[in-house]
Amino acid sequence: MAVTVETLDKLERRITLTLSADELKNEVESRLKKLARTTKADGFRPGKVPMSVVAQRYGYSVQYEVMNDKVGQAFAAATGEAQLRVAGTPRITEKDGSADGQVSFDATFEVYPEVTIGDLSALEVERVTTEVTDVAIDRTLDILRKQRRTFADRPQGEYAVDGDRVTIDFEGKIDGETFQGGKAEAFQFILGEGRMLEAFEKAVRGMKTGESKTFPLAFPADYHGADVAGKEADFLVTLTRIEAQNLPEVDAAFAESLGIADATVDGLRADIKKNLEREVKFRVAARNKQSVMSALEKVATFDLPKALVDNEMARLVENARADLKQRGIADADKAPIPTEMFQPQAERRVRLGLTMAELVRANALSATMEQIKAHIDEMAQSYEKPEEVVRWYFGDQQRLSEVEAVVIEANVANFVLGQAQVVDKQLPFDELMGA
């Protein structure tokens, strides 16, 4: 069939769809007859309800359904004939003055842009690498020891020091009034681990069991408790118990308690290094991928379909609402979230998505099943029962699709790094893990 396409804007198009009125009428009658076989109505046997009753009950909804189906089919056929890649959902409006026996509609829609990728060899992309050092292994060992430490009461008269578990009663007042969350009994925390404000810990450090102390404390302006943020309180603290920590020795017994196959100190350190290297690999890949994505924005300039940007903005708003709900914000569903605030982020995501899709298409960068399985196997190694994790991923197509997307992004990143001017940078372990 001949399809006439009007260009309304850079990406906006319009086509006219013409349907046969008789064809629409016949389809409506056919569907109503099918419904009549199962329609029930008082005073009539099943399947014997008059067509006039069936039409009165279902006529409007069936007409709407048929019109939607036929217009959708005609639109798909017309855009396929014209070889148009439709972005978003078309706006359909009925035209006046159609010829006898016909019903005409205008379909207005956007098409995907022609994505042209610039010279990748002109890009400068930073690629980081990170080594797992003995210092990082030692720090992990310290964490493991603390997870398995025990505590014992300090002798009467000894001072509280960092690493001790202290039990206190406290009451804080602002302008002479106790504030919410400012009073507790038998409250425990470990000195020096940053659970409490530094000024609070400093006051408790050096106290003895049974000792009481009063001191002022200024809450930071960005303190998570909005009622006290930026205010000064007066605290009364009584220290009721001090327990010194006992850290296990790093020896074969400690390695065995952790389930290390090679239950030696060297075996334990090797196992820690392997796990840290796995985590470093994922973090380095994520950081390098981000560098690639930022660079790609410089070589991909094209118009964006408004429909895709609008859809992405709506998705980001829903994500923001979900985040508010998770934080326990009341009436998160009704919270006024301006859609426009997400427009720059949505435009960037759409642009990157279209750019990556073109790179994947033009350079055969789709994920293979071997790559997907290898990625899942590698992730599973950080769990106690890797085989169960693998089965969990392969048991759901949505989860597999998520892994596939990650692998495709990695393929694109590696391809771009192979084409661009790469600036290698050694990133300290702490900086990578703190990112």
Curated annotation (Swiss-Prot):
**Where does the PPIase FKBP-type domain start and stop, copy by copy?**
163-248
Task: State the UniProt keywords alphabetically.
Answer: Cell cycle, Cell division, Chaperone, Cytoplasm, Isomerase, Rotamase
The family database entries (Gene3D superfamilies) matched by this protein are listed as: 3.10.50.40, Trigger factor ribosome-binding domain, Trigger factor, C-terminal domain
One MF annotation (Gene Ontology) recorded for this entry:
ribosome binding
What InterPro entries has UniProt attached to this entry? PPIase_dom_sf (IPR046357), PPIase_FKBP_dom (IPR001179), Trig_fac (IPR005215), Trigger_fac_C (IPR008880), Trigger_fac_C_sf (IPR037041), Trigger_fac_ribosome-bd_bac (IPR008881), Trigger_fac_ribosome-bd_sf (IPR036611), Trigger_fact/SurA_dom_sf (IPR027304)
The catalytic activity, as recorded, is: [protein]-peptidylproline (omega=180) = [protein]-peptidylproline (omega=0)
SUPFAM superfamilies in the record:
FKBP-like, Triger factor/SurA peptide-binding domain-like, Trigger factor ribosome-binding domain
Q: Where in the cell is it found?
A: Cytoplasm
Keyword field contains Endoplasmic reticulum: no
Q: Which Pfam families match?
A: FKBP_C, Trigger_C, Trigger_N
- The protein's role, per its UniProt record: Involved in protein export. Acts as a chaperone by maintaining the newly synthesized protein in an open conformation. Functions as a peptidyl-prolyl cis-trans isomerase.
Swiss-Prot/TrEMBL domain comment = Consists of 3 domains; the N-terminus binds the ribosome, the middle domain has PPIase activity, while the C-terminus has intrinsic chaperone activity on its own.
The protein's name: Trigger factor
Q: Which species does this protein come from?
A: Leptothrix cholodnii (strain ATCC 51168 / LMG 8142 / SP-6) (Leptothrix discophora (strain SP-6))
